[in-house]
């Protein structure tokens, strides 16, 4: 196996789970998520970018995968197809979650992409506010504001009918 193939295999092993979670939350579909991940790794393989650090590589992969998700959503919005059957693929990612966690995840999926991106990177993947800002190429204050708006949206959803107390 040559060095490029070994590098690609190492990148896939290292980052595929994290990128899958990010893309699945955006696309809400296992098959589309896998397509976007394949495109992301092909871009990595063909461009062979140089990175200053592993964090830079990770941020680049997240950025490319998010851009591919946006591109995918734009394309399918313009070229809407009628699904043959509606399959609830959320079961794949929500297996093992309690009802409150499933409802919260469902509400996150329904957020606009700007809010959803910061919520996924900060709360699900675990990046700090500054790291999230670097990845999304926005200011830290913009990340904080979007997180605040996302929390407010979740609170208002819970007040609108869902009641949960720990």
Predicted regions and their residues:
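Residues within the DNA-recognition helix of helix-turn-helix
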Residues: 15, 36, 146-149, 153
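C-terminal edge and immediately downstream basic/flexible tail or linker adjoining helix-turn-helix-like DNA-binding
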Residues: 1-9, 80-85, 134-137, 151-166
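Internal acidic/polar
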Residues: 78-106, 128
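Sigma70-family region 2
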Residues: 2, 28, 39-56, 76
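A short, charge-rich alpha-helical start-of-domain segment used by transcription regulators
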Residues: 1-21, 34
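Structural recognition of an alpha-helix C-terminal capping motif at a helix-to-coil junction
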Residues: 21, 35-42, 55-67
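Helix-turn-helix DNA-binding module
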Residues: 109, 113-117, 125-142, 153-156
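Arg/Lys-rich amphipathic alpha helix in sigma70-family domain 2
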Residues: 63-82, 149
């Amino acid at each position: 196996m040559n060095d490029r193939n070994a590098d690609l295999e190492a990148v896939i092993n290292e980052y595929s789970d994290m990128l899958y979670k990010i893309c699945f939350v955006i696309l809400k579909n296992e098959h589309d998520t896998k397509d976007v991940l394949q495109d992301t790794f092909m871009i990595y393989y063909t461009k062979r970018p140089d990175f200053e650090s592993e964090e830079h590589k990770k941020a680049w992969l997240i950025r490319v995968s998010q851009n591919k998700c946006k591109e995918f959503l734009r394309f399918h919005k313009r070229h809407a197809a009628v699904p043959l059957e509606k399959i609830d693929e959320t079961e794949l990612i929500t297996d093992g979650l309690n009802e409150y966690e499933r409802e919260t995840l469902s509400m996150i999926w329904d957020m606009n992409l700007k809010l959803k991106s910061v919520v996924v990177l900060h709360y699900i993947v675990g990046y700090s506010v500054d790291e999230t800002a670097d990845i999304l190429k926005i200011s830290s204050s913009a990340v904080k504001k979007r997180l605040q708006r996302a929390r407010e949206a979740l609170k208002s959803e819970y007040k609108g009918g869902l009641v949960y107390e720990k």
